[in-house]
């Protein structure tokens, strides 16, 4: 897939969205697989390839859920492979409050926000240049921004929030 015309064509886009999905291969962040599931090695490779291209050109990138995790691994960070209490319950997203540090994210949404949670993994050690700007009450990183690149990641799914952020 790395040589596919689709990936080469995607690099011409103005921005990159890294969506949610299965877990990244733990070997990509130096760990053995202890709790990762739904692995898609070809997807990992394709997203990391695209991310490298967009970073080289300093184009905007937004990572959502798995996308935040891909960003963190790309910049040399690690992941918590299994995080109890953050995955969906009975097929529905959990809701919880987060606190946001002074940042463009706080400018958009304020100091506290109720977000959804549908993940069982999260950022552990942050990658180079990434700064945590939002946390769950238990300390789980819920959003990051890069210190010098137009790169943001959120652990929650803004596209599934009800209320003013929702398109429905």
Where are these predicted regions, by residue range?
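Flexible gly/pro-rich beta->alpha loop and the following alpha-helix that scaffold active-site loops
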Residues: 1-62, 75-76, 80
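Glycine-rich nucleotide phosphate-binding loop and flanking beta-alpha elements
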Residues: 23-25, 68, 123
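Active-site phosphate/pyrophosphate-handling residues
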Residues: 49, 69, 121
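Pocket-forming structural segment of enzyme catalytic cores
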Residues: 57, 75-147, 158-164
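Active-site-proximal beta-strand elements of phosphoester/diester hydrolases
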Residues: 152-156
